[in-house]
Amino acid sequence: MLIPKEVKSAISQLRKNNFEAYIVGGCVRDLLRGAAAQDKALGEPRPAEAGREPEDWDLTTNAKPEQISKIFPRSFIDNKFGTVTVLTNSKNPKLKEIEITPYRIDEKYTDKRHPDSVKWAKNIKEDLARRDFTINAMALDIKSEIRSLKPETNSKFQTLNSKFILIDPFDGQRDLRNKIIRAVGKPEKRFSEDALRMMRAVRFATIFGFEVEKMTREAIKKNAPWIQAISKERIRDELIKIIMADRAADGIELLRKLGLLRYILPELEEGYKISQNKHHIYDCYEHSILSLKYAAKRNFNKYVKVAALLHDIAKPRVKRGEGLDATFYGHEILGAKMTAQILNRLKFPKKEIEKISKLVRYHLFYYNVDEVSESSVRRLVRQVGPENMDELLQVRMADRIGSGVPKAEPYKLRHLRYVTERVSQDPISVKMLKTTGNDVMKILKTKPGPKVGQILDVLLGIVLSDPKKNKREFLEKEIKKLGKLPEKELKDLAQESRKGREKLETKRDGMTKKKYWVT
């Protein structure tokens, strides 16, 4: 993998001014993961969990913020920790900005969120010691151009014609190879500095498919209540990253096992061990997790995934009775209200709250091919919003698989898709014309009657054959011509036009049926 020229240039500039400079943190982790996967695959396509190009590039140096700014005139200091954002001329969005942070040591964390103050560290190892996990506490010292990384030793890596040194005082490379999430130093101290790190441990384990090391796990279990000190916005952002991961269901379950879920989504944990009825083989919590698992497998969007996780959130509160005949009447109505409350608590945007709540509210819609009319489908589309119908059906699919049924989209759901598209299509009618019955009467100086409708029918037939002719000027000329035709001839033309329209409607309906494999 090539180190981008923008990154190498920034390192070079710092070194020319007699400062140290290293690539650091998550981008080193991603570089090593990508190289390891590539080396293992021997040129074959890399697996989904393989490393990827870093989302951003972070550098660290022994230069102070003012010194960095002097070296890079197109830069600004953007926080109290001395991070300097350097602007580049790169066309790559990921490289338009490069963050350079001085070596630092974080002082006491009173609020378990941010250091009360920072002081500059003497060397790179002191800086790495303040970081969260060993896999993020590595730095890369570029000695010359790097073409690929091959992590097979502890300190040096050889490439075809260049070399570099990995600064790895906490054995992050070993943990990376062994797929371990381990806190740097004492886990409890790391989490007391920033309690959100407990969620980050879950997020990294979820995204990478890693295990959380025992001492790190125990520290999270012991100190899970600390997460309450974190702002809801930061919790929301971490939660969404977990939900959007391929292994989202595993991530939510890990939050529960580590004792974090009760402080993040206590309503979801209420469903743990709450049995359902004859229509379900899983308890309320398991059903929600499995619904999310299917949504993740199908790569549905964020709204569907959140709705899949929360769609039965109210079941524990409305449950009546036990065993096979237990009921959950109204859970979709209360569930929509609870979903709105949860998302509002987590500071989701208002539009997202409305959309996801609506998906929860209507996820239980009733549809049987021979029992539900088109007017009922129109009403559902109107209530949910045509823009949300696909997502509602996806939530229903996730709900079905989460219930243990073998088929996500049975015939009746495909048929509903067909009817939904059919009722949402613009009808083929004279309303499509760029003229009206009033125009016909005005041009021909006539009164309302069959002749007006016949002329509009003929005009529609002309426009359906050639949509470009649906222009007011052309239609006015045609109205004058048609107005001169004998009554019978005009009547026959109108009838022929209506037959053509019916054929077109039948053809369109047939294509829609074929699209959804229904009859």
Task: For every predicted segment, state its role.
Residues 1-519:
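Catalytic cores of the polymerase beta-like nucleotidyltransferase superfamily
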